[in-house]
């Protein structure tokens, strides 16, 4: 099965800063610490669908 593009949104400000290819069969949401340009620091980013 092909990978789907999902957006990673900052949990602090809600800005969608990154897009990644993710396996659609995965049931839990992807959560990664990434840099947010709007917050100007590293924050937790979670998958949006």
Swiss-Prot record:
The keyword Ribosomal protein applies. GO terms for cellular component: cytoplasm; ribonucleoprotein complex; ribosome. GO terms for molecular function: structural constituent of ribosome. The keyword Membrane does not apply. Keywords: Ribonucleoprotein, Ribosomal protein. It holds the Pfam family Ribosomal_L33. SUPFAM superfamilies: Zn-binding ribosomal proteins. GO terms for biological process: translation. Disulfide bonds: none annotated. HAMAP family: Ribosomal_bL33. NCBIfam families: PRK00504.1, PRK00595.1, rpmG_bact. Belongs to the bacterial ribosomal protein bL33 family. This is Large ribosomal subunit protein bL33B. It comes from Pediococcus pentosaceus (strain ATCC 25745 / CCUG 21536 / LMG 10740 / 183-1w). The gene is rpmG2.
């Amino acid at each position: 099965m092909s990978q789907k593009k999902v957006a990673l949104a900052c949990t602090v400000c809600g800005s969608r800063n990154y897009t990644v290819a993710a396996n659609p069969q995965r049931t839990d949401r992807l959560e990664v610490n990434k840099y947010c340009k709007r917050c100007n620091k590293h924050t937790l980013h979670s998958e949006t669908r």
